[in-house]
Amino acid sequence: MIPEEMFPGLVSAGGVVYRCCGKSLQVVVCSRQVPFSNNLPKGTPDPGEILEQTASREVEEETGLKVEILDYVGFIEYDVNQGGASGKSPKRVYYFLMRPVGGDFSLHDNEFDIVQWVKDINISSTLTYDNEVDIVKKGLSMVKRRSKGTP
């Protein structure tokens, strides 16, 4: 499902978790108060995990939802501060399109203060980072194509 190329930097995996609500779509957003941010759920692989396993596990830990992976959406890249003399390191986050199949927000871990559904029309003004907005838009366009039966 994901490119087989090796990435020399840090790697994480996460999810664009969606649900249909009437005629609109909603996406899970995780919020932190200090420092303030609204993000998609994601995290670092445990030893021996493939990225799909990491994405599912991290989404369940951070949101409380059990999910099913439907497709690979894409990745984003950015630099993270590593501290010390090395400065910044590149990081790549792989995202998967997911739907909830169980669980509940009340079961989320303490990494985020709030986990909530956000309407698709509000996602651009809600998420902190534009690259995550782009991933959500790509994922939701995949959902819309699926519902119309087009590849």
Annotated model-derived regions:
Residues 1-22:
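Acidic, metal-coordinating catalytic segment for phosphate/diphosphate chemistry
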Residues 14, 26, 114:
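Conserved beta-strand and immediately adjacent loop positions that scaffold enzyme active sites
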Residues 20-26, 84-88:
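Short, solvent-exposed loop/turn segments that connect beta-strands within catalytic domains
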Residues 125-151:
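Charged phosphate-binding loop/patch that engages nucleotide di/tri-phosphates or the phosphate backbone
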Residues 28-32:
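Short, acidic/hydrophobic/Gly-rich beta-strand patch recurrent on exposed beta strands
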Residues 34-36, 107:
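A conserved beta-turn-beta hairpin within the catalytic core of GNAT-like acetyltransferases
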Residues 45-134:
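Unchanged
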Residues 39-42:
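A short gly/proline-enriched turn/hairpin at secondary-structure junctions
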